[in-house]
């Protein structure tokens, strides 16, 4: 036999799929979910954990699962065994399964039957299956024999957009077909006079003005619900559809979705709808919206299911997420908004301010200087005191804590501050702090040990008052501890404050958007053991001029650290310290994560809130350790969970330009505000939590544009990763080592996600998401991979620097550190620090004469990135970017990525550059040379010698004086016409002979492979190594014109003898190299549509290679050499 026949071909097997969830069905206490051709089985038993118990791979071949139909059992018991028909596209398969005692067994599986048309619906009929096909016909199928028993078409052979089969026997079978003419056609297949004889429709139902995507029939009440492209849901009174000639009445026309409605489901008491706007609505049968579930991202919710006994709704989205929600009557309910009826003849004056002391006591002050208390339990108002000094202008703030520590503070326009014990208001303490107006008040609490009140006066002076209580608890003591002085600004007062644990510093935010760090007491910085290395002179008394007109001068402690204008001109709204970090929010629509090192504030990460919520008002840490964001979205107050992307509470309050207060405990949440001269109160039980379950986290809401593997972490036995598979369910050879691959993905949804992919569980865990980009992210590059602690003290984990770029010519650099953490589901935690950013038009925004200049095209996109690591000590790497405006740009990273500057550029290609790739050439007795390859939409390749360019002009490594005029990159060392159209994939690999193997894939489906030689020539006018100039020459060149049927978007040379390519034709193909033209070895069909990128890497000798494919989803393959 020929030696090639004995070669073991690489056979790639799918180990993980993250695709849109297109099918859901509750069977007893189990949930079946369809994801591509795979079936996920979840246990919904309340006695155990809500978890996945099995993934059945490739059940439907190359078809996507769209639905499940369970055969009814005579005894109605589906808790032990079930016969399930799985269908999607043109495929159908029947499976008998057993799932008792938390295990899953597949008892029997039929063959995969391919229908001649699209399957819209399936229904069991006495052991057979009826199928509604795409051109308005019905097929009766025998699942045991695998043959068609009968096929009946309709006289209207139109294309259908949905269908619903009704009935339990062939004689009474009814089909409701949604035609592209926006009509519902009701007809009866059993009335056919002969086989294949068309049947005329019995009824035509009109009403929708768009295509009907889904329908649901409730037999007990004779109702039919339809969902349409016209963004509406209609409810029809149809009676018993199994009886011909019935009357149809439209009893409900429901508008609530802002986009197309994909799915609808009728329950006994509810109607569930879900659509393209990623919202699942719960309606009454009268058309009233009862609940709205928001949390999925992207292009919509594709599948819904309901568990009526447990009152659950399950949704599956385009983001690959699966969520479980509680219907009305289960879990926590909002108590709604109620007016507290303040207006009364016994309570004169107009309300000026309101605050909350805990979740059940409310304080309000009027323009007469009267302070009132409202007890939510007693539901009555009580006047605590009245002080004429606090007429007209009055600030009111309650002390933090579960019930406000029983204290509140008032301030007026004459510099007076009053601290009031709520239970004994006669023991209030007055102090005059300033000769002018008090601009703001805030409390700072350190556990139960220390309570401070900060008051801002004229000239940026902040008085710090120490509050303590007498042993009897009936009196309080107010003592001024020190004074701080804010940096100069137009509106010079603080807005919020918090203790930085362990309590040596105070973190404050001011009206100009700055975050400041102050010592919590005078003389603190004299102690060398506190605060680390503070700046010289920081915290020392400084002098500021007052604004009272008397020429008085105030002295105060200056900040030891300042982050000026961090949140823009609208100011900082809150400061929270948790887990060693400082979190700040502002009215710029962002929240920052900061930390203090050596007495200095340092930004870690900037995150955006949900779209449209530009006024962030606060941040809370909930009992499970996650955070929720408070803010205003137009005229609504919103409590938003950034992890689940869900709006937990929405209150239509009229906006944030009013007095309002928020308080939350584990038992309840309260939001009070002034509107129409009265106090309005919204309360919800359960605090800032929502009793819903995320069965599986979503990944990205839009297409994945780039996949990049960072490295591998080995977890010891103490960090064992839990597996949802039983040991006897694992596939042979899948028992790999306890390795976890860290992969970075970026997407058109403007986020960069860090994933953990264990080799043993076939699962994916999203560790964190970075949301700094303002447009789609197209490319990611990684450099500086290491371990925590560095080479001297290596620790378990992984560190790396990441550069991401995309639309609006925007680039960001950040570092990640992945460390073991047994408290998380993935047993890993990821810490992200944002280092720097760059936009091409930043310099233009700072130009005073910009009206005379031509602005850089704001639509420029970065298409690809490549990191070029220099061999010169002390210099950071270069980042090469392929740009849509025809340029190849080089950026210089300095100070470990904290400085990112444009260095050089070239417009050689004169058209959109799609790919850049860097590689090095190393030869004996010669210095290492850095080369760059770029590819454009005309199919040309250009090779640049970066080492020669840097040697000839040493000033190139210094950033240009004018950021708008970078250096020129020069002319390429070699140009090559490799393809007839755009090049979407590019890779190189050094050979043993000292050459380079270069491969490229094009939009025309072709591959181009050639061997590149780098020869060093001596210049006549130069001597030594500096006079050596590389000459690039092609030694061998081969092409495969029809390697794929569509764009080749992924390419990797695994070794000098094997190459793998991926294309939009959904084929992963292996090629043999080294024997002339690349020859076909093997091909595997993958399930990710519109694949945009691919990355392959070796894992271990036991596990072989892994390959990640990203597009409209993510799929991971592995194969053995």
UniProtKB/Swiss-Prot annotation:
Record keywords, A-Z: Acetylation, Cell cycle, Cytoplasm, Repeat, tRNA processing, WD repeat
Top-level taxon of the source organism: Eukaryota
Subunit structure: Interacts with FTSJ1; the interaction is direct, and required for 2'-O-methylation of position 34 in substrate tRNAs. Interacts with IRS4. Interacts with STK11/LKB1.
Residue ranges of coiled coil: none
This protein's name: tRNA (34-2'-O)-methyltransferase regulator WDR6
The organism of origin for this protein: Homo sapiens (Human)
Tissue and organ expression note: Ubiquitous.
GO annotation, biological process: G1 to G0 transition; negative regulation of autophagy; negative regulation of cell population proliferation; tRNA methylation; wobble position ribose methylation
Organism lineage string: Eukaryota, Metazoa, Chordata, Craniata, Vertebrata
């Amino acid at each position: 036999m020929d030696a090639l026949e004995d070669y073991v071909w690489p056979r790639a097997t799918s180990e993980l799929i993250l695709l849109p969830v297109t099918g859901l069905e509750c069977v007893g206490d189990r949930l079946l979910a369809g994801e591509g051709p795979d079936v996920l089985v979840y246990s919904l038993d309340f006695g155990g954990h809500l978890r996945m118990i099995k993934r059945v791979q490739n059940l439907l071949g190359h078809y996507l699962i769209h639905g499940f139909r369970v055969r009814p059992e005579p005894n109605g018991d589906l808790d032990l065994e079930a016969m399930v028909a799985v269908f999607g596209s043109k495929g159908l398969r029947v499976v008998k399964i057993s799932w008792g005692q938390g295990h899953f067994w597949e008892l029997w599986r039929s063959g995969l039957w391919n229908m001649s048309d699209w399957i819209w619906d399936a229904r069991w009929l006495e052991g057979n299956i009826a199928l509604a096909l795409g051109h308005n016909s019905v097929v009766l199928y025998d699942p045991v024999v695998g043959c068609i028993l009968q096929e009946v078409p309709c006289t209207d052979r139109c294309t259908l957009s949905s269908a619903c089969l009704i009935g339990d026997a062939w004689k009474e079978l009814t089909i409701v077909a949604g035609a592209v003419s926006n009509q519902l056609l009701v007809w009866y297949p059993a009335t056919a006079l002969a086989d294949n004889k068309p049947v005329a429709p019995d009824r035509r139902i009109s009403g929708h003005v768009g295509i009907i995507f889904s329908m649901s029939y409730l037999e007990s009440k004779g109702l039919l619900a339809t969902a349409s492209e016209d963004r509406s849901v209609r409810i029809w009174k149809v009676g018993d559809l199994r009886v011909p000639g019935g009357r149809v009445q439209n009893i409900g026309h429901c508008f609530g979705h802002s986009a197309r409605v994909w799915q609808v489901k009728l329950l006994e008491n509810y109607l569930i709808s879900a659509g393209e706007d990623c919202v699942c609505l719960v309606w009454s049968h009268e058309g009233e919206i009862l609940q709205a579930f928001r949390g999925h991202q992207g292009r919509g919710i594709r599948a819904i299911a309901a568990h009526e006994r447990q009152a659950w709704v399950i949704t599956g989205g385009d983001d690959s997420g699966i969520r479980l929600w509680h219907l009305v009557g289960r879990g926590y309910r909002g108590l709604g908004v109620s007016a507290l009826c303040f207006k009364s003849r016994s309570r004169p004056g107009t309300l000026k301010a309101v605050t909350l002391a805990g979740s059940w006591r409310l304080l309000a002050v009027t323009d007469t200087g009267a302070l009132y208390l409202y007890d939510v339990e007693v539901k009555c108002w009580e006047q605590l005191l009245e002080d004429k000094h606090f007429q007209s202008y009055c600030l009111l703030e309650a002390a933090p804590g579960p019930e406000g520590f029983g204290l509140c503070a008032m301030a007026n326009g004459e510099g007076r501050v009053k601290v009031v014990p709520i239970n004994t208001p006669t023991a209030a303490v007055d102090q005059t702090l300033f000769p002018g107006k008090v601009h703001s008040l805030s409390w700072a609490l350190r556990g139960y040990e220390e309570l401070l009140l900060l008051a801002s006066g004229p000239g940026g002076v902040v008085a710090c008052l120490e509050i303590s209580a007498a042993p009897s608890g009936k009196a309080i003591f107010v003592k001024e501890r020190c004074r701080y002085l804010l940096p100069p600004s137009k509106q010079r007062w603080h807005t919020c404050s918090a203790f930085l644990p362990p309590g040596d510093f105070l973190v404050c935010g001011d009206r100009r958007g700055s975050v400041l760090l102050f010592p919590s007491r005078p003389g603190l910085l004299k102690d060398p053991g506190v605060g680390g290395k503070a700046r010289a002179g920081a915290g020392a008394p400084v002098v500021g001029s007052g604004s009272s007109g008397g020429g008085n001068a105030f002295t105060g402690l200056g900040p030891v650290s300042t982050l000026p204008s961090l949140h823009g001109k609208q100011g900082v709204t809150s400061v929270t310290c948790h887990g060693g970090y400082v979190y700040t929010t502002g009215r710029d629509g962002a929240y920052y994560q900061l930390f203090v090192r050596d007495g200095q504030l340092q930004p870690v990460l900037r995150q955006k809130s949900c779209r449209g919520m530009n006024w962030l008002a606060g941040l809370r840490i909930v009992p499970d350790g996650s955070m929720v964001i408070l803010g205003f979205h137009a005229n609504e107050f919103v409590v938003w969970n950034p992890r689940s992307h869900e709006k937990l509470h929405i209150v239509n309050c009229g906006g944030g330009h009013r007095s309002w207060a928020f308080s939350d405990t584990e038992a309840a949440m309260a939001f009070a505000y002034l509107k129409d001269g009265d106090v309005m109160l919204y309360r919800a039980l359960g605090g800032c939590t929502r009793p819903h379950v995320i069965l599986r986290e979503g990944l990205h809401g839009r297409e994945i544009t780039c996949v990049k593997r960072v490295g591998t972490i080995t977890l010891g036995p103490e960090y064992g990763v839990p597996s949802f598979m039983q040991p006897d369910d694992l596939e042979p050879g899948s028992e790999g080592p306890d390795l976890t691959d860290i992969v970075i993905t970026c997407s058109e949804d403007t986020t960069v996600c860090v994933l953990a992919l264990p080799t043993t569980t076939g699962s994916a865990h999203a560790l964190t998401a970075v949301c700094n980009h303002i447009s789609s992210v197209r490319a990611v590059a990684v450099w500086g991979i290491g371990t925590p602690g560095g080479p001297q003290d290596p620790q378990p984990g992984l560190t790396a620097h990441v550069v991401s770029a995309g639309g609006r010519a925007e680039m960001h650099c950040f570092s990640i550190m992945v460390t073991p953490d047994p408290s998380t589901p993935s047993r890993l935690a990821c810490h992200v620090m944002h280092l720097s950013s760059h936009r091409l038009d930043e310099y233009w925004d700072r130009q005073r004469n910009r009206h005379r200049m031509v602005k850089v095209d704001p639509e420029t996109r970065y298409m690809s990135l490549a990191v070029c690591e220099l061999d010169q000590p002390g210099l950071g790497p270069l980042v090469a970017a392929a740009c849509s405006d025809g340029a190849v740009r080089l950026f210089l990273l300095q100070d470990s990525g904290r400085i990112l500057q444009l260095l050089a550029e070239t417009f050689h290609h004169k058209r959109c550059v799609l790919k850049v790739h860097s590689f090095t050439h190393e030869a004996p007795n010669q210095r290492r040379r850095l080369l760059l390859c770029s590819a454009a939409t005309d199919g040309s390749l250009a090779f640049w010698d970066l080492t020669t360019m840097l040697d000839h002009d040493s000033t190139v490594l210094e950033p240009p004086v004018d950021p708008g005029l970078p250096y020129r990159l020069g002319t390429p060392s070699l140009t090559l016409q490799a393809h007839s159209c755009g090049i979407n994939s590019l890779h190189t690999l050094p050979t043993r002979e000292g050459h380079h193997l270069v491969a490229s894939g094009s939009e025309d489906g072709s591959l181009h492979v050639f061997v590149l030689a780098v020869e060093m020539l001596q210049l006549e006018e130069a001597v030594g190594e500096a006079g050596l100039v590389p000459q690039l020459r092609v030694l061998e060149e081969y092409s495969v014109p029809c390697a794929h049927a569509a764009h080749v978007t992924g390419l990797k040379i695994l070794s000098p003898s094997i190459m793998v390519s991926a294309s939009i034709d959904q084929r992963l193909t292996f090629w043999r190299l080294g024997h002339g033209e690349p020859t076909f070895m093997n091909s595997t069909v993958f399930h990710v549509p519109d694949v945009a990128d691919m990355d392959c890497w070796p894992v271990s000798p036991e596990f072989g290679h892994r390959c990640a494919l990203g597009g409209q989803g993510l799929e991971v393959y592995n194969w053995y050499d």
